[in-house]
UniProtKB/Swiss-Prot annotation:
It is found in: Cytoplasm. InterPro entries: Myotubularin (IPR030564), Myotubularin-like_Pase_dom (IPR010569), PH-like_dom_sf (IPR011993), Prot-tyrosine_phosphatase-like (IPR029021), Tyr_Pase_AS (IPR016130). Keywords: Cytoplasm, Hydrolase. Residues 647-668 have a biased composition (Basic and acidic residues). GO terms for biological process: phosphatidylinositol dephosphorylation. The keyword NAD does not apply. This is Phosphoinositide 3-phosphatase. The active site is at C397.
Length: 688
């Protein structure tokens, strides 16, 4: 409580979704709370959800200022803002809060509350910028009645790797299974950012794994993350290799990749090629060589063509190994793109002002959709290579915990209907994001930074604004006031966007790249891609859009412990399963709210026993993204579908998004030309 300089302020005006409400503001240790007789329920906002706070001179209504220094209102607005009539809008102090979930609200403090406004601002800063995760709400949160009544298993135990791989058709205890469970990382000493249980080829020893780890960034060796039973194909994941400038190689790493590509349950399935996927742009991957990293030298990994001492019988027609650069941008590009999108969407959100269409149409704003489209394009290519070529796939980026997690998890959603179910999606997140070390704490910025806070009143002089000697008052207009200018008066009542306060808002909104260097909405971007698949296949997902939206909220709310660590090791070091609750408690206890009523129950891939008829298994429908239908997630942004997507739908076919030809590379060192992954043309497989 020592962080709270003031706990309660009366007669504060809350502006939210275009509605002004006068009431009482409360500041608690973990939430900002606003109550008013005009509200049916209290408004609660958790501090970790804060994306930015701006303390500005004047009321937020100055954003509605017209060329005549009037706030022109009509209809219901007249009653909504009646409490401002006759008051000098510059006499107020406004605190505007932008949420990581795109919620925007502002608090107006009257002329006699300036000191209280300062204390509120300082208190919010103190309660938001923290030094340790134990200060977060999750560590004192007590489950409600619904969550306490949940049946077993405990939500922390919803993902059991042995059980999950058995569902996929792999029983590690069966000696005939080509994959085994390794405990080399049982105490996280082998690789601190990997899960304790690793599935590797049965033909490899733990000694080989230890030697191979020296050749991979962060020791994140290639391991199995998914087995597709219908095609007997495997998806592996790792980090980048470490050839460096002198082009080093590792026989053990090459052996591990070879054995992984050669570990089949069904040896009779014809395979044409396997794929090593580097999710980065080609130039970025090669530039990493100067830092000791890099990408695979395909002379060493194309086992049928290479002299690599793997004991490969070259008289056999073995599948070739192809390398593919996806060209997906890094976390810094994602962060900058999301920051600009947030600025455009959230400015004026407290007053529910319309989006500026010239910004919506801009190239810079649309970059977010282009990033997502490229990810989905990449997933589409890999999906069809697995389905039609029966290819094994190894995916990595730099460290293998951002772009790699996005690609492999989306690929699994497209391949396996189980991951499109309510519980299946939770297991997927636990498997490919939490256990494989996506840095949730770091990427989400839960401990925040004071760079998010902008006090624009520190050096303000309220008298330096030219108002022609008059106060800025609310002018309440009747129907007659607008009768004469019904057609021609629009220009005179347009909003002024160039006021000093608006400029300051825009300038201060930019993130400090140094202080928040590793904060990036990577997991949110993944959820956005899942949203695209859901809207394109509305009857093939058991969960609904609201499920994804609430997951974004609880990614940042810090009410639960699931997203408060950077790895499985950190989760247990912080004792999160015992000290906090799992986020899946929230969803499982409210299941009916998040179930899609249009979901068509189908036979789930690999869910039955191993003797399940394979022909029936192959009838299970896989899905692929329709790149022409990628759209804005308007529900998340609190905007109208027409406002964000109408223009996009009109020009949908005019600017196709594709992977750069330079991103496709043949496995031979002298190739370097574009390559079709499938022996078929991809464009002919638009069916779901």
């Amino acid at each position: 409580m020592e962080y709270i300089k003031i706990a309660k302020v009366s007669n504060v005006v809350l502006h939210r979704r275009g509605t002004a409400t006068q009431g009482t503001l409360h500041l608690t240790t973990h939430h900002l709370i606003f109550e008013s007789p005009q509200l049916s329920t209290e408004f609660w906002f958790p501090y970790p959800l804060i994306y930015g706070v701006h303390k500005n001179p004047g009321s937020t209504l100055l954003s509605k200022l017209t060329s005549t220094n009037q706030i022109q209102l009509e209809g219901t607005d007249s009653q909504n803002y009646k409490l401002y009539q006759g008051k000098d809008l510059w006499s107020f102090v406004n605190i505007k809060v932008i949420g990581k979930d795109y919620a925007v609200f502002s608090l107006d403090f009257g002329g006699d509350l300036h000191l209280q406004a300062r204390k509120v601002y300082d208190s919010i800063l103190n309660l938001t910028v923290l030094s340790n995760i134990t200060q977060l709400y999750a560590f004192i949160y007590i489950s409600n009645n619904l969550e306490r009544k949940l049946p077993s298993p405990d939500s922390w135990d919803i993902y059991d790797p042995i059980k999950e791989f058995r569902r996929q058709g792999l029983d590690s205890k069966d000696e005939t299974c080509p994959w085994r469970l390794s405990t080399v990382n049982e105490h996280y000493e082998f690789c601190p950012t990997y899960p304790s249980k690793l599935f590797v080829p049965r033909s490899t020893s733990d000694i080989l794994l230890k030697h191979a780890s020296k050749f991979r960034s962060q020791k994140r060796i290639p391991v199995l993350t998914y087995h597709h039973k219908a095609t007997d194909c495997n998806i592996l994941r790792s980090s980048q290799p470490l050839p460096g400038l002198i082009n080093q190689r590792s026989i053990q790493d090459e052996k591990l990749v070879w054995e992984s590509f050669n570990s089949f349950c069904n040896k009779d399935i014809r395979r044409t090629k396997h794929v090593i996927v580097d999710a980065r742009p080609r130039t970025n991957a090669l530039a990493q060589m100067a830092l000791g990293g890099g990408t695979e030298n395909m002379d060493n990994y194309n086992f049928f063509l290479a002299d690599n001492n793997m004991g490969v019988d070259k008289s056999l027609k073995l599948p070739t190994v192809t390398r593919l650069f996806l060209g997906i941008d890094n976390i810094h590009i994602v962060s900058n793109t999301a920051a600009y999108m947030t600025e455009v969407i959230c400015q004026g959100g407290d007053l529910n002002l319309p989006l500026e269409q010239n910004l919506i149409r801009s190239q810079k704003f649309s970059n977010w959709l282009k990033l997502n489209t490229l990810i989905l394009k990449s997933v589409d290519m890999l999906l069809k290579s697995i389905i039609f070529n029966h290819s094994n796939v190894l995916v990595h980026c730099s460290d293998g915990w951002d772009r790699t997690s996005q690609v492999v998890s989306l690929l699994e959603i497209c391949l396996d209907p189980f991951y499109r179910t309510f519980e299946g999606f939770m297991i997927l997140v636990e498997k490919d994001w939490c256990s494989f070390g996506h840095r949730f704490l770091e990427r989400s910025g839960h401990l925040n930074s004071d760079i998010r806070f902008h006090d624009n009143t520190m050096h303000s002089n309220f008298n330096d604004v030219d108002t022609n000697g008059d106060d800025l008052d609310i002018g309440v207009n009747t129907q007659d006031d607008y009768a004469e200018d019904d057609e021609g008066g629009e220009d005179e009542t347009n909003l002024i966007n160039l006021s000093r306060i608006s400029k300051k808002f825009n300038e201060n909104f930019k993130l400090n790249k140094k202080s928040l260097k590793f904060v990036s909405p990577v997991f949110q971007q993944f959820l956005d891609c899942v949203y695209q698949l859901l809207t394109q296949n509305p009857d093939l997902f058991e969960f609904n859009e609201r499920f994804l939206r609430r997951l974004v909220y609880h990614l940042y709310s810090c009410q639960y412990g699931t997203f408060l660590s950077n790895s499985e090791k950190e989760k247990f070091q912080q004792n999160l399963p015992n000290k906090t609750k799992s986020v899946w408690d929230y969803f499982r206890s409210r299941r009916k709210q998040f179930i899609n009523p249009n979901f068509i129950q189908r036979k789930r891939s690999g869910m039955n026993e191993h003797d399940q008829n394979l022909e029936e298994e192959e009838k299970v429908e896989w899905i692929s993204p329709d790149l022409k239908k990628v759209q804005w997630w308007w529900q998340l942004y609190g905007r109208k579908d027409s406002e964000m997507n109408d223009e996009l739908r009109h020009k949908r076919d005019s600017v196709p998004i594709s992977v750069d030809k330079k991103s496709k590379e043949h496995s031979n060192s002298d190739g370097g030309k574009g390559l079709n992954l499938s022996i078929f043309g991809f464009d002919m497989f638009n069916r779901k």
